[in-house]
Curated annotation (Swiss-Prot):
EC numbers for this chain: 6.3.2.8
Protein name per the record: UDP-N-acetylmuramate--L-alanine ligase
Gene transcribed to yield this protein: murC
One Pfam family this sequence matches: Mur_ligase_C
One GO molecular-function entry: UDP-N-acetylmuramate-L-alanine ligase activity
SUPFAM superfamilies: MurCD N-terminal domain (SSF51984), MurD-like peptide ligases, catalytic domain (SSF53623), MurD-like peptide ligases, peptide-binding domain (SSF53244)
Subcellular location: Cytoplasm
Pathway: Cell wall biogenesis; peptidoglycan biosynthesis
Native source organism of the sequence: Escherichia coli (strain SE11)
Reaction catalyzed: UDP-N-acetyl-alpha-D-muramate + L-alanine + ATP = UDP-N-acetyl-alpha-D-muramoyl-L-alanine + ADP + phosphate + H(+)
Length: 491
């Protein structure tokens, strides 16, 4: 952002002129990095710390940010404010140093709320589908020439970034319920895609507490704001009478205000009709597979229609939608002969879904688009608590694939829980008699253990939220072929 644009911003938020240097602890996370990227483009001095470099930190360094790959007290020196990720503990040396120096320490969502305060905010919340829906809304607004600012939890592939500073009045942001920090946001429009039991440690294990928190989030809307909610979701349907704001519903359900009908999937694309009140039916081609993505698109269309965006711009954006990183992310199709001597090919798809509902949606999309493929899943459970709490749901969903390889649970800082490990989950699935899961004890063995199960007509789903995304990319780079020691030596 040039000096004139920065001056304009600071005239809108005059108190922000006091802030020069913003430091982020845990800056490598997608949500943290996205906000840092917007602020860097607004002209603020950005620094941050994390334990290891990744594409997010590299992008920020390209923008001039100073990144430390350690956590030391001196990193916060001269900072005007410190922004902290929910993954960072209170005894982090930088947090302690900031408190001692009386530097304000705020959560990520508080900074996002400041960015949203003087813009027309559109916040996308819900247990599943937030990232993709945020990208769809952003794509439609960009196609309509509205030049929105967006902050997303995943890579928006069309833009090549998680976040972008626009010069229009709209800020479109993913709203995170995992730590209840979305309560800081005060948007004009809020989408809620669905509500399920997840991140229950934040809500003291009380689902009623989680539901009430979503109601409180919606009541942050002004009385003239709008809640856009998926009426197919039973919890949302239950909560609708308690939402004291204007609402628009969407879904496959017949009483939805924006209704999806005649859905058909052909390969990676969904084709369906959207029925809207007082509008002509809209026949949509969506460049994203699965009924769940048709619902995400319906939410985006509901918001865009309310804003008065013309149908042609909406349709162009959805047909050309490039998706988000690690959401049914097609990494390539590879010949099998170099892998195991068989003729034919294997498709490789990477997906972030780590809740049974998300995994189920991904499997259904794969089956609908490629019904004749041998469906092979490499799955990495994420967190011992989630594996424990949703154990039976995982066991039921994972039996739907033809072949299952499972990595050890990605702990995300948690201690192991007896019976909530991958070996136990494999044993339970095997006992149900549908498939015989293969436990992969070492990620370095994935290519070697994957090769023998491929038939020549395969779709491989690499599924999970831990470090499994790196495994997916490494498989794509070596085209699924296990490397020999000689090849590894020369890399």
């Amino acid at each position: 952002m040039n000096t004139q644009q920065l001056a304009k911003l600071r005239s809108i938020v005059p108190e922000m002129r006091r802030v020069r240097h913003i430091h982020f602890v845990g800056i490598g996370g997608a949500g943290m990095g996205g906000i840092a990227e917007v602020l860097a483009n607004e002209g603020y001095q950005i620094s941050g710390s994390d334990l290891a470099p990744n594409p997010v930190t590299q992008q920020l360094m390209n923008l001039g940010a100073t990144i430390y790959f350690n956590h030391r007290p001196e990193n916060v020196r001269d900072a005007s404010v410190v922004v902290v990720s929910s993954a960072i503990s209170a005894d982090n040396p930088e947090i302690v140093a900031a408190h001692e120096a009386r530097i304000p320490v705020i959560r990520r969502a508080e900074m996002l709320a400041e960015l949203m305060r003087f813009r027309h905010g559109i916040a996308i919340a819900g247990t599943h589908g937030k990232t993709t829906t945020t990208a769809m809304v952003s794509s439609i607004y960009a196609e309509a020439g509205l030049d929105p600012t967006f902050v997303n939890g995943g890579l928006v592939k069309a833009a090549g970034v998680h976040a972008r500073l626009g010069h229009g009045r709209y800020l479109i942001a993913e709203a995170d319920e995992s730590d209840a920090s979305f309560l800081h946001l005060q948007p004009m429009v809020a989408i809620v895609t669905n509500i399920e039991a997840d991140h229950m440690d934040t809500y003291q294990g009380d689902f009623e507490n989680l539901k009430q928190t979503f109601i409180n989030f919606l009541h942050n809307l002004p009385f003239y704001g709008r809640a856009v909610m998926c009426v197919d979701d039973p919890v949302i349907r239950e909560l609708l009478p308690r939402v004291g704001r204007q609402t628009t519903t969407y879904g496959f359900n017949e009483d939805a205000d924006v209704r999806v009908e005649d859905y058909q999937q052909i390969g990676p694309q969904g084709h369906f009709t959207l029925l809207r009140q007082d509008k002509e039916p809209m026949r949509v081609t969506l460049n994203a597979p699965g009924r769940h993505n048709a619902l995400n698109a319906a939410a985006a269309v509901a918001v865009a229609t309310e804003e008065g965006i013309d149908d042609e711009a909406i349709l162009r954006a959805l047909e050309s939608f490039q998706g988000t990183g690690r959401r049914f992310d097609f990494l390539g199709e590879f010949p099998l002969e170099p892998v195991n001597g068989k003729s034919g090919t294997a498709m490789l798809v990477d997906d972030y879904g780590h809740h049974p509902t998300e995994v189920d949606a991904t499997i259904k999309a794969a089956r609908a688009g490629w019904p004749d493929k041998n469906l092979v899943m490499l799955f990495q459970p994420h967190r011992f608590t989630r594996t424990r709490d949703l154990y039976d749901d995982f066991a039921n969903v994972l039996t739907q694939v033809d072949t299952l390889l499972m990595l050890e649970v990605y702990p995300a800082g948690e201690a192991p829980i007896p019976g909530a490990d991958s070996r136990s989950l494999c044993r339970t699935i095997r006992g149900r008699g549908k498939i015989d899961p293969i436990l992969v004890p070492d990620p370095a063995q994935v290519a070697e253990m994957l090769a023998p199960v491929l038939t020549g007509n395969d779709l491989i789903l690499v599924q999970g939220a831990g470090n499994i995304g790196k495994i997916a990319r490494s498989l794509a780079e070596i085209k699924l072929k296990p490397q020999t020691p000689e090849e590894e030596q020369h890399d």
